[in-house]
Amino acid sequence: FRELETALIKSAPLGATLRFSTPSIERLNEEFINYLNFGGYPEAVLNPAIQADVQRFLGRDIIDKVLLRDLPSLYGIQDIQELNRLFTTIAYHTGQEISLDGLAQSSGVAKNTITKYLEYLEAAFLIVRIRRVDDTGKTFQRMRNFKVYLTNPSMRAALFAPIADGDDAMGAMAETAIFSQWFHSDLMKNLHYARWKQGRTDLEVDLVRVDPARLKPTWAY
């Protein structure tokens, strides 16, 4: 990775910060897609055979070891396939706004069961839920709508198939990759996304940091 970084990312002073550029945006985008698909698994990065059949080598690992064995034994889950359906639904829609009603409809799992499973999946550090705020940075009393991110964007490729340039999921996967860099930060508990209506138009800001003392946004991406 260090060789790629040196070859593809250049930096130069710009006032008190740095300005970044690249000699080849096409190559940089290609490597970013490789990161989305395989970057979370060092064994895949270093082994073309695993990349060629990532679902077989890594997807079954996630399903068999974590979902079908570890979580059921930890939490006494009886209906393993129900948990599997919920997780695969979440993984496919990583980075998108969802609701308990929508999850129940798409996965076929009851809402009260979904609530428990979401807590289990978060405890296993497979997913992270992000709360919604309005255009002033205020949270809602009831979390009817929220976003769920995979903690590792490469899990989606392992469960389904690697994505390519132009795929519909590219935006959500890129968003998942950016959020994943914050998951170990102390700021994580203050990160949200903003969504509100302006007339008939839905507006959204993907990443908003809210000051917990003033309950006001301090920065956004």
Where are these regions (language model features)?
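Residue-level signal for well-ordered alpha-helical scaffold segments within enzymatic catalytic domains
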Residues: E3-T6, N34, K65, Q181
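A residue-level signal for conserved active-site and pocket-lining positions in enzyme catalytic cores
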Residues: L4, G39, L86
